[in-house]
């Protein structure tokens, strides 16, 4: 199967690309921005460079995007590219251009332009932040999905949505909670944070990748949305405490050192029953096992 992945240099995208590239059944292409012509890709992609086709395009440019899609002629597209994932101050115009217009350009390039064949499925990767849309990133992602759903309903384009919940694990930037807490804990330092009362559904990166692959292999009705999570809620305070327990290096969380964000959704777990019914998938890595794996990985990287 010919597979095109946008956002393959990101946290989830690189893990997905590496796993798919290792499967001899697939020909995997990754669409990345032009600046990767002069700077290295993430190491996990370099390790698979002989099994990856790299195409360069800026999704904000329809002509370049259409050219890249024609070059690959994918059977399956995973759309993970997004701007501002960890930037709460992302400019509104930048969010709209990258996340809304970029998605629309990819959809049109995949299904509207004349080609010998069109993808049998495009998987749009969403964010649980869409449920509250507290920043331009989340709001623009929510708007992009509404257009995906509209095209699926009105034109029958085979677009599916996948919403991974709070993903953590190797490759995540330390601006995120678990990775930042893990780095501080391994250094024996304290970790300033909010009171940590928010409850979230935490899922390890390997489970997310397996779920994305299961969606890509399924025959789903256009407009279907699948949530990837464990179905279990754990508070932010509990997660950070567990991080310090698993590292055992000293230091600790400083609860209440930072203010909570107003309006944040307090609790929402993934709909795991629907995921199991639609794609035959469920998370298999417990929270304690996932944190232990992540800790071991970071220690190995530092050795």
Model-inferred region functions:
Residues 117-127, 147-170:
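Conserved beta-loop-beta element that borders a ligand/cofactor-binding pocket
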Residues 1-76:
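N-terminal Rossmann/SDR dinucleotide-binding element
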Residues 139, 161, 172-183, 194-214, ...:
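Substrate-positioning beta->alpha
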Residues 142, 167-179, 189, 205-206, ...:
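Glycine/proline-rich active-site loop of Rossmann-fold NAD(P)-dependent oxidoreductases
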Residues 23, 287-303:
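Amphipathic terminal alpha-helices
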């Amino acid at each position: 199967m010919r597979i095109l992945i946008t956002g393959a240099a990101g946290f989830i995208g690189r893990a997905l690309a590496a796993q798919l590239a290792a499967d001899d059944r697939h020909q995997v292409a990754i669409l990345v921005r032009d600046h990767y012509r002069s700077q290295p890709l993430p190491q996990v992609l370099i390790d698979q460079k002989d099994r990856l086709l790299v195409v360069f395009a800026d999704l904000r440019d329809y002509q370049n995007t259409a050219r890249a899609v024609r070059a690959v002629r994918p059977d399956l597209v995973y759309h993970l590219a997004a701007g501002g994932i960890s930037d709460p101050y992302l400019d509104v115009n930048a969010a709209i251009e990258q996340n809304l217009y970029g998605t629309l350009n990819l959809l049109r390039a995949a299904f509207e332009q004349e080609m010998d064949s069109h993808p049998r499925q495009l998987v749009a990767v969403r964010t649980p932040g869409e449920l509250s849309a507290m920043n331009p990133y989340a709001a623009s992602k929510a708007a992009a999905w509404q257009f995906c759903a509209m095209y699926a309903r009105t034109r029958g384009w085979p677009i599916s949505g996948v919403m991974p919940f709070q993903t953590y694990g190797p490759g995540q930037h330390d601006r995120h909670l678990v990775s930042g807490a893990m780095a501080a804990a391994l250094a024996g330092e304290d970790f300033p944070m909010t009171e940590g009362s928010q409850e979230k559904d935490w899922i390890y990166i390997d489970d997310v990748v397996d779920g994305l692959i299961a969606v890509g292999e399924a025959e789903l009705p256009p407009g279907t949305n699948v949530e990837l999570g464990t179905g279990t809620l754990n508070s932010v305070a509990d997660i950070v405490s567990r991080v310090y327990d698993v590292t055992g290096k000293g230091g600790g969380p400083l609860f209440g050192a930072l203010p909570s964000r107003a309006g944040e959704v307090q609790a929402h777990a993934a709909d795991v029953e629907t995921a199991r019914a639609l794609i035959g998938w469920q998370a298999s890595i417990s929270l304690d096992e996932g944190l232990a794996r992540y800790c071991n990985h970071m220690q190995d990287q530092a050795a």
